[in-house]
Amino acid sequence: MAGSIEANITQFAVGQGGFLVGRIWRTAQNAQREFTYAFDCGSINREHFETGLDACALSRLDVLFISHLDLDHVNGIDALASKMQIDRVVLPCLDTLQSIVLACEGSDDAGVRGSIASLLRDPVAWFGERGVKSVYFVGRDSSGEGPDMRNTLGANPPDSPRPRSNGRSHKSREGEEERLPYSIRGERESAVQQIKTSRGIVEYMTFEGDVQVSVEPDVGALVSDPFVWALIPYVHPFSKITLDVFARAASNVLKKQVPIGTGLVTKRFTKQLLATLCNESSRKALKACYAILSSDNNLPSLSLYSGPVKPLHPTRIWHNVRSGQGPQFWRHRLPLGEIEGCAWLSTGDANLSSLQTRAPWLKRYEQFLPAVAVFILPHHGSNRHIHDDVLSRMPSSIKVACAATERAKHPHPSLLRRLDLLGQSFVQVSEEQPSEFSLQVKLSG
């Protein structure tokens, strides 16, 4: 059917971490075509992740989105890659800032741990050795204001064609007619480059500004088709003043100027960074530098909107929320008919309390927030990572915290009280399998 599309999005129970899988499909002439994606794949407890992975029946992912490279969000990638083919990975660009954060987080008394060091030295090869065919880096917002919404695909005049950039279009190849075509485009893009690994050729490129993955009935479809399903990643900025202070402090430790641009870090800089972190005093000094930006080493983080590019009237949306949880897991559960949206918005560990990150984040997603049915609270339900200004813009959405049951402050009791006062639904996805949470929607004309 040209006039309908279905989606099933599931947050699997992996404890203190995250593992979301989405299926987007269309059925026409008794044939079904689908697109599959995941958001994050890790947990502090590896057994919890593997149990959640066992519950996932997929054999192939078109795209794996990674919010950031903290272990509890990505340490399950080897287990994931051993179970299913991962075609493409989208993650925050490993610029100088990201590389320093990852190196500091992955260092111990002997320096940077082997797997992290290998990833830093050649991230494209690292993913390629796990069977990934393409690696797409999304640059951190450097404007501090959020992308210009006039360039956003969903904001074009109804009958105008999509703004064209080189991008990458992925059509169904011979023998893969069951896959839906999709494309990834950005406001600004690097040239496509390739490297050779033992598993084959891997291509990579960097996208900046407004970035969107479009799952379409036809790769050349106009944006006026309301059933184009979009996956919109966004990596929030830091304030320029704070970045400048950090760069000066880090430059003193590394004894060379630290660039704060959003492009891929050079191998030369990475080599010096790894060598510096072998020294205990330098390691402590560099970690202290990062505290200028973040006290918990969780930034920057990629968020992901998954839903239609155009607003749809509620009568054109069919919902099915599935959870094995009893009423004790819910707070102010809304009747199903009051859930007005059909989209899912994941946030990783984004700091949506700070005005410096919240304002551009809201600017990027504001036109899509009315469509959000499920909102994943940042940083496992941390009270200091979310502002009421964000929560109040999605009053009917279900708020979800991905957190293990034994964590005292995830979700934080103060956040639960705030949600109570706002009259909003809340559910926790823990390591307990009945807490797995799914949203299925069908959009029809």
Task: Identify the residue ranges that each predicted region occupies.
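C-terminal regions of proteins
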Residues: 378, 382-394, 402-445
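Hydrophobic/aromatic beta-strand patches that form the interior of the parallel beta-sheet core
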Residues: 10-12, 65, 90, 136, ...
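Active-site metal-binding motif and surrounding structural segment of the metallo-beta-lactamase
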Residues: 45-91, 366-384, 395-399
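Active-site environment of divalent metal-dependent phosphoester hydrolases
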Residues: 69-74, 96-98, 143-144, 351-355, ...
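Active-site HxH/HxHxD metal-binding segment of metal-dependent hydrolases
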Residues: 74-126, 396-400
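Core dinuclear metal-dependent hydrolase active-site scaffold
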Residues: 1-59, 128-132, 136-370, 436, ...
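A structural signal for short coil/turn segments at secondary-structure junctions
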Residues: 84, 131, 394-395, 423
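Short, aromatic/basic amphipathic alpha-helical patches
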Residues: 51-53, 103-111, 118-127, 360-362, ...
